[in-house]
Amino acid sequence: MDYTPLIEKRRQRLEELETVIAEPDFFNDQKKASEIMREHRRLKELMETWDSLNATEQQLADNQELAKTDDPELAELAALEIPELEAALEKLRSDLQ
């Protein structure tokens, strides 16, 4: 499933919230400010997790390719990191659910 449109929508909302938070009178309504800050924090954490997931997926793919190279030392180093990357991916996927 392609989550790109959903993630982009969330990223746009995060940018909107950051613009609102930057306004000088943002804290005049404490209740509204608190709600916005809570939503901002949740979206920021989501985007950070999503970005980490993508970076880890790319690193895993790179390591899988490097593990097939003719350089035995490089292949071994890359292969050693694969289980760690797979575990990190599982955790990130779990965090997104």
Which role does the model predict for each range below?
Residues M1-Q97:
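Charged, heptad-repeat coiled-coil alpha-helices that serve as long linker/dimerization "arms"
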